């Protein structure tokens, strides 16, 4: 159950981050049309929904797992969002980024053994 809640937390907060990026990309296109056009976009609403669900999953997870064990696992969002940035938004990811992601994964694996 805890692993499922952690995965749901990661996916929902990751989706929320991606939806925020899509929000600002859309807002750039409709900037001249004002706030009404911005608020008609589905992206900010998806961001709010996903982040709200991520918060709910996180709170449920914290009922079952110590925060000192659970919180480092959220660092996997850096990995998830960086991969989405690279493959969905075609943002550059260089060797330095990849090295950082590997260090994050190694750190999470190291801390996960203690949990």
From Swiss-Prot:
Name of this protein: Probable 4-amino-4-deoxy-L-arabinose-phosphoundecaprenol flippase subunit ArnE
Organism from which the protein derives: Pseudomonas paraeruginosa (strain DSM 24068 / PA7) (Pseudomonas aeruginosa (strain PA7))
Superkingdom to which the source organism belongs: Bacteria
Keywords noted in UniProt: Cell inner membrane, Cell membrane, Lipid A biosynthesis, Lipid biosynthesis, Lipid metabolism, Lipopolysaccharide biosynthesis, Membrane, Transmembrane, Transmembrane helix, Transport
Intracellular or extracellular location(s): Cell inner membrane
Assembly mode: Heterodimer of ArnE and ArnF.
UniProt entry tagged with the keyword Oxidoreductase: no
Pfam families: EamA
Protein encoded by which gene: arnE
HAMAP family: Flippase_ArnE (MF_01869)
Family annotation (InterPro entries): EamA_dom, Flippase_ArnE, Small_drug/metabolite_transptr
Biological-process GO terms, alphabetical: lipid A biosynthetic process; lipopolysaccharide biosynthetic process
Membrane topology reported for the UniProt record: Multi-pass membrane protein
């Amino acid at each position: 159950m805890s692993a499922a809640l952690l995965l749901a937390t990661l996916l929902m907060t990751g989706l929320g981050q991606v939806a925020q990026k899509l929000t600002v990309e859309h807002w750039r296109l409709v900037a001249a049309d004002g706030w009404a056009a911005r608020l008609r976009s589905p992206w900010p609403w998806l961001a709010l929904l996903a982040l709200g669900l991520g918060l709910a999953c996180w709170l449920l997870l914290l009922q079952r797992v110590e925060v000192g064990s659970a919180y480092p696992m959220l660092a996997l969002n850096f990995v998830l969002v960086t991969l989405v940035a690279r493959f969905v938004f075609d943002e550059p990811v260089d060797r330095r980024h990849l090295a950082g992601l590997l260090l994050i994964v190694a750190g999470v694996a190291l801390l996960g053994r203690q949990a």
